[in-house]
Amino acid sequence: MSIHVKLHLGYQDFALDLDLQLPGRGVTALYGHSGSGKTTCLRCIAGLEKAGRGRIQINDEVWQDSQRKLFVPPHKRSLGYVFQEASLFAHLSVQANLEFGLRRIAKAQRRVDMAQATELLGIGHLLQRHPQHLSGGERQRIGIARALLTSPRLLLMDEPLAALDSKRKSEILPYLERLHDELDIPVLYVSHSQDEVARLADHIVLLSDGRALASGPVGETLARLDLPLALGDDAGVVVEGRVSHYDPDYQLLTLQLPGSQLTIRVAHEPLALGKALRFKVQARDVSLSLQDSEHSSILNRLPVTVRDEIPADNAAHVLVRLDVAGSPLLARITRFSRDQLSLHPGQQLWAQIKAVAVLA
């Protein structure tokens, strides 16, 4: 299963030129600054804009092929589209809004039913309300449920959290994670938030000025030093681990790194043993030492190997890429510290991780 998107679309001051081969499963994030082409790409896939030259194929369905002069209109494309703000019918109840999406699909073709959509998004208690009596986060969950009830082969989400405050975002993120875990519907997710991408996406496409700078698994791509992602204050890595222990006395969760016996400890509520989850480590929260120090308040000290380095976003710092038993790690340190430690590729030393963010 795969998604092929080849687009060339020119405006007076902007050109979109993409050739992407994307996974046909999971969540793919289109990530980049404002004006990079994220939403234009999504609109072309939806058929809301027509690329002058291009081909769009979702698994075995071709929606556009300019060489064959084929263009499937938007209403005939099996997709769901979630905008920044949910466009709900104000005069209809939540249930009637959802039924509007459901009625578009013949019963024999429905892959998501009303009960499943309302349970996944936690909206069963809202069915008799009207949109004007809902919070922003609730309206967005209704919009997502309505898109799912069209039983799409592809779900497009255009910055669905952008219009929400931080509290509403934190409320809706767990529901988006459930969609990822429980539905076999590929998602293209537009965002300029690296935290959202790190938490939700499996694959990332980094866009800039209408072109793809990189495309690959989230963990690998965020750790690349040759991309602009590495230069900002948000530079860091996303690692997948499994819960191996919980200490109820100190309320510490122990996470085992993939393919090794190394562990990370983090203050967190208890989670089921064996549960897979992601965590993020910012480069600014990693320091380096030539030897381990047990007499330290820093819980997480790991043996690492230096891979390479690049200048950081200011002249005083460098960004060092490290290997931790096969998993990447970044450290942002001063050039003075680099020289004091005589850092070089292949060198073995200790990383001291001052903070870990569990993405769940």
Curated annotation (Swiss-Prot):
The keyword Transit peptide does not apply. It is a peripheral membrane protein. The complex is composed of two ATP-binding proteins (ModC), two transmembrane proteins (ModB) and a solute-binding protein (ModA). Belongs to the ABC transporter superfamily. Molybdate importer (TC 3.A.1.8) family. Its EC number is 7.3.2.5. Pfam families: ABC_tran, TOBE. It comes from Pseudomonas fluorescens (strain ATCC BAA-477 / NRRL B-23932 / Pf-5). It catalyses: molybdate(out) + ATP + H2O = molybdate(in) + ADP + phosphate + H(+). Gene3D superfamilies: 2.40.50.100, P-loop containing nucleotide triphosphate hydrolases. Coiled coil: none annotated. The gene is modC. One of its GO terms (cellular component) is plasma membrane. It comes from the Bacteria. Its main location: membrane. NCBIfam families: modC_ABC. The keyword Cell inner membrane applies. ATP binds at residues 32-39. Residues 5-234 form the ABC transporter domain. This is Molybdenum import ATP-binding protein ModC. GO terms for molecular function: ABC-type molybdate transporter activity; ATP binding; ATP hydrolysis activity. It is found in: Cell inner membrane. Residues 295-360 form the Mop domain. Part of the ABC transporter complex ModABC involved in molybdenum import. Responsible for energy coupling to the transport system. Keywords: ATP-binding, Cell inner membrane, Cell membrane, Membrane, Molybdenum, Nucleotide-binding, Translocase, Transport.
